[in-house]
Swiss-Prot record:
<dbReference type="GO" id="GO:0008270">
    <property type="term" value="F:zinc ion binding"/>
</dbReference>
<dbReference type="Pfam" id="PF00096">
    <property type="entry name" value="zf-C2H2"/>
</dbReference>
<dbReference type="GO" id="GO:0021797">
    <property type="term" value="P:forebrain anterior/posterior pattern specification"/>
</dbReference>
<keyword id="KW-0479">Metal-binding</keyword>
<comment type="function">
    <text>Transcription repressor. Involved in the axonal projection and proper termination of olfactory sensory neurons (OSN). Plays a role in rostro-caudal patterning of the diencephalon and in prethalamic formation. Expression is required in OSN to cell-autonomously regulate OSN axon projections. Regulates non-cell-autonomously the layer formation of the olfactory bulb development and the interneurons. May be required for correct rostral migration of the interneuron progenitors.</text>
</comment>
<dbReference type="Pfam" id="PF13912">
    <property type="entry name" value="zf-C2H2_6"/>
</dbReference>
<dbReference type="GO" id="GO:0045893">
    <property type="term" value="P:positive regulation of DNA-templated transcription"/>
</dbReference>
<keyword id="KW-0217">Developmental protein</keyword>
<dbReference type="InterPro" id="IPR013087">
    <property type="entry name" value="Znf_C2H2_type"/>
</dbReference>
<keyword id="KW-0863">Zinc-finger</keyword>
<keyword id="KW-0225">Disease variant</keyword>
<dbReference type="GO" id="GO:0006357">
    <property type="term" value="P:regulation of transcription by RNA polymerase II"/>
</dbReference>
<feature type="short sequence motif" description="Engrailed homology 1 repressor">
    <location>
        <begin position="28"/>
        <end position="43"/>
    </location>
</feature>
<feature type="region of interest" description="Disordered">
    <location>
        <begin position="428"/>
        <end position="475"/>
    </location>
</feature>
<dbReference type="GO" id="GO:0043697">
    <property type="term" value="P:cell dedifferentiation"/>
</dbReference>
<protein>
    <recommendedName>
        <fullName>Fez family zinc finger protein 1</fullName>
    </recommendedName>
</protein>
<keyword id="KW-0678">Repressor</keyword>
Length: 475
């Protein structure tokens, strides 16, 4: 039994070093208390690369910004992995991991230095204060995969870089050239404006960036070239804004405007709504009827203006004859009567008119065609307007009544003509036609002095019955 215990003890002592070696070679746990409580060292600011030193102003101290800084910084695109060429035997997510761990210099441009994603991000953060004064000249890089590129742009294309399509074949990992565009507002503060550019199939949606040369450093550009690029970029930006604000849904800006032609008279309109309002001229439809006088109108707005006629307010008065009107436009037309101005002259008979409406109605009398006919008495008219008022004669609807004799009329015009011809002439107050120039109203009748009657005499006493004695005595 002692021998068996001795053998067991020997085996335990022999396996103890092996177990110690296994424990020492095991990986440390990611959630260990020591790693959690350990203080994370702050990242060191990288020195400025030599190819960026020429673009920075000298004489000013540089303050490095760390990744955990609270100061916001504008990055031209979301950081992605950069790689010069796909490595053989590496597939899936390994190229991205390999490029992050060991960045290599670009093979196409041996003189251009390469930096990893963290280097570019650290440089952009450290040079954030100089972005408003100088452009960052970046060299050529290659995107690992196309993706949406979000960045905040500056005024007039800004000091950040724009991406354009490369000259190589369309491949997910093909080269994407990055070139700087000088900012027109170098001394102005940065105003972020969110924009999104889509990098799909190696084609970035950037308008007309092919006009700028790719792969040109900022220090190699002359002042004239910078001024040219600044003006051109501002012009491109204004054209882009004008194109977005233009009415793109209605067609191209260079397209001819749509016209709507009336099939009856050939009149042209720029909108279909105006053509619809014009068609009742030919159809004769007047759906808007005045409830006071029964006059019909093609438009509701005309009916609203017509209703002012039936009101008692007439603020616009003629200075020559004292006649008052509801609207100033009617007064202006009335002044043509006193001036004898008749701009609308009939080309058939030479008769002049003060108003265009009366001129059009008169021209229809020369046509000889009366297409609007009454169904009751077969009387024809040139206009449907006259036929509408003629129908009142058959239904005994006469809204205008003479206050003197009580006779009714269909139109107010007929009532005024009746009063002027009959009642004014009977009272001796007939008016002269106002249309004839140089006519004056008749002078008033001379006033006669009042008649004076002689004073009244007292009446004579009536004689009484004669007495016989007195009568005989006189004899």
């Amino acid at each position: 039994m002692d021998s068996s215990c001795h053998n067991a003890t020997t085996k335990m002592l022999a396996t103890a070093p092996a177990r110690g070696n296994m424990m020492s070679t095991s990986k440390p746990l990611a959630f260990s208390i020591e790693r959690i409580m350990a203080r994370t060292p702050e990242p060191k600011a990288l020195p400025v690369p030599h190819f960026l030193q020429g673009a920075l102003p000298k004489g000013e101290p540089k303050h490095s910004l760390h990744l955990n800084s609270s100061i916001p910084c504008m990055i031209p695109f979301v950081p992605v992995a950069y790689d010069t060429s796909p490595k053989a035997g590496v597939t899936g997510s390994e190229p991205r991991k390999a490029s992050l761990e060991a960045p290599a210099a670009p093979a196409a441009v041996p003189s251009a230095p390469a930096f990893s994603c963290s280097d570019l991000l650290n440089c952009a953060l450290s040079l954030k204060g100089d972005l408003a004064r100088d452009a960052l000249p970046l060299q050529q890089y290659k995107l690992v995969r196309p993706r949406v590129v979000n960045h905040s742009s500056f005024h007039a294309m800004g000091a950040l870089c724009y991406l354009n399509r490369g000259d190589g074949p369309c491949h997910p990992a093909a080269g994407v050239n990055i070139h700087p565009v000088a900012s027109y507002f170098l001394s102005s503060p940065l105003h972020p404006q969110p924009k999104t550019y889509l990098a799909e199939r190696n084609k970035l949606v950037v308008p007309a960036v092919e006009k700028y040369p790719s792969g040109v450093a900022f220090k190699d550009l002359s002042q004239a070239q910078l001024q040219h690029y600044m003006k051109e970029s501002a012009q491109l930006l204004s054209e882009k804004i004008a194109f977005k604000t233009s009415d793109f849904s209605r067609g191209s800006p260079n397209a001819k405007p749509k016209v709507f032609t009336c099939e009856v008279c050939g009149k042209v309109f720029n909108a279909h709504y105006n053509l619809t309002r014009h068609m009742p001229v030919h159809t004769g439809a007047r759906p808007f009827v005045c409830k006071v006088c029964g006059k019909g109108f093609r438009q509701a707005s005309t009916l609203c203006r017509h209703k002012i006629i039936h009101t008692q307010e007439k603020p616009h008065k003629c200075n020559q004859c004292g006649k008052a009107f509801n609207r100033s436009s009617t007064l202006n037309t009335h002044t043509r009567i006193h001036a004898g101005y008749k701009p609308f002259v009939c080309e058939f008979c030479g008769k002049g008119f003060h108003q265009k409406g009366n001129y059009k109605n008169h021209k229809l009398t020369h046509s000889g065609e009366k297409q609007f006919k009454c169904n009751i008495c077969n009387k024809a008219f040139h206009q449907v307007y006259n036929l509408t008022f003629h129908m009142h004669t058959h239904n005994d609807k006469k809204p205008f009544t003479c206050p003197t004799c009580g006779k009714g009329f269909c139109r107010n015009f007929d009532l005024k003509k009746h009063v002027r011809k009959l009642h004014d002439s009977s009272l001796g107050l007939a008016r002269t036609p106002a249309g004839e120039p140089g006519t004056e109203p008749p002078p008033p009748l001379p006033q006669q002095p009042p008649m004076t009657l002689p004073p009244l005499q007292p009446p004579l006493p009536t004689p009484g019955p004669l007495q016989p004695g007195l009568h005989q005595g006189h004899q």
